[in-house]
Amino acid sequence: MHSPRWLLLAALAFACVASAASPARTFQTRTLEGWTVRIDDRLLTPANKAVTNKALVLLAAQLKEVVRLIPAGPVAQLRKVTLWLSPPYPDEEPRASYHAGEQWMLQHGRIPAMLKGIEFANVSIFERETQRMPLFVLHELSHAYHDRVLDWDHPGLAALYARAVASRSYDCVERSRGPKRPITFEPAYAMTEPTEYFAETSEALFGRNDFFPFTREELGTHDPDMLALLQQVWQLPAPPLPTAPTA
């Protein structure tokens, strides 16, 4: 019978072999609108460089909008989030993700340095994503703000999410998939979980979401308490009180 020590040594030896077989990833570092951006070197090869450069232009434009739309205090917090550009992963759809959990990252081949950062493994479809979700970078940054600044268990947000689910007011709403594509009616992505409720409504607050409520005005009519909470946590000035009519 093999001893536990022998098994441990065997496991460590296997890990060393696996590590040697998988070359370490290397990245180039750039700064866009005050954010640190780490670009996987494989995206900068001649075959990929043009697509990557176009994605970087679009990313810079989205970050510039974030700076324009969001108050300086929250922007300073958002700029602490490192952005990572990666090639697509085998057996995964190209996507952008905020990495909050080490366990998920280890299981899906991400490097530890990406923890609490945002990874864009969707460079090839970046332009299409900006058409579908005009503020999709803000969506991911909202996840980071929720985790790093507000805390995942923010009590006010949790209560409003539970109330929205119970009300069923998001069960069948309009969805826009981009220019020249028909509007559909679906359950709102915001109801997936509280994190998506915050990110989706933050898109509506600052610009246009791809699900109803699309805009700040629609959010104020559909979910006024959530609008009020968002204005508070994003440090927006209080809206002016209505002026009394003059005689």
Write out the residue ranges for each language-model feature.
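Structural recognition of the beta-strand scaffold that forms the well-ordered cores
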Residues: 38, 82, 144, 197-201
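Acidic/His-rich structured neighborhood in mature extracellular/periplasmic domains
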Residues: 56-162, 166
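Metalloprotease/metallohydrolase-associated module, dominated by Zn2+-dependent proteases
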Residues: 112-114, 161-246
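Soluble non-cytosolic domains of exported or imported proteins
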Residues: 46-61, 127-132, 136, 189-193, ...
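Boundary at the C-terminal end of the N-terminal hydrophobic targeting segment
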Residues: 18-24
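Bacterial N-terminal signal peptides
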Residues: 8-17
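Bacterial N-terminal signal peptides that target proteins for export
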Residues: 1-8
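Acidic/histidine-rich, surface-exposed loop or edge segments in extracytoplasmic proteins
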Residues: 31-53
